[in-house]
Curated annotation (Swiss-Prot):
Optimum pH is 8. It comes from Solidesulfovibrio fructosivorans. Heterotetramer composed of HndA, HndB, HndC and HndD subunits. HndA and HndB could form a heterodimeric intermediate in the electron transfer between the active site of hydrogenase subunit HndD and the NADP reduction site of the reducing subunit HndC. Signal peptide: none annotated. The gene is hndB. It catalyses: H2 + NADP(+) = NADPH + H(+). Inhibited by oxygen. InterPro entries: Thioredoxin-like_sf. This is NADP-reducing hydrogenase subunit HndB.
Length: 126
């Protein structure tokens, strides 16, 4: 990560973030927590199952991301899904079966799926 030393650096960083965000518009973003506790709880298996389900159903416009701790250790593995034009939704306790269900029910149909973790923060966009 580059060091921000001036207001111009900050403006350039903001534009870089906005450009990355614009490239994602219209895509479904699936962000899987792969911190140590999530990996130990089966996070990699959940991510692989979701990737397999996306491929099996021929879905396009789905981007996978990996993140570190989402601070929901009690609910690992956790997955944050952002559907186009919607706020992100975080799901907890995502095992292989739940991962596949998230793709077929939530990603493909927009249907709510059990395991939503209530939002306890507000996003700040620079």
């Amino acid at each position: 990560m580059s060091t921000i030393r001036s207001f111009e650096d900050l403006k350039a960083k903001r534009q870089e973030i906005l450009d990355r965000k614009a490239a994602r518009n219209g895509k479904t973003i699936i962000n899987v927590s792969l911190a140590t506790c999530s990996i130990a709880a089966g996070g990699k298996v959940a991510m692989e199952a979701m990737q397999d389900e996306v491929a099996k159903n021929g879905l396009t416009g789905v981007e996978f991301m990996q993140s570190s701790c989402m601070t929901y250790c009690y609910a690992e593995p956790t997955v944050e899904i952002t559907l186009p034009g919607k706020d992100p939704v975080v799901f907890g306790g995502v095992d292989e079966n739940r991962a596949r269900e998230l793709v077929t029910e939530y990603v493909m149909k927009g249907e709510p799926v059990e395991g939503i973790i209530p939002v306890n923060y507000e996003r700040v966009v620079l």
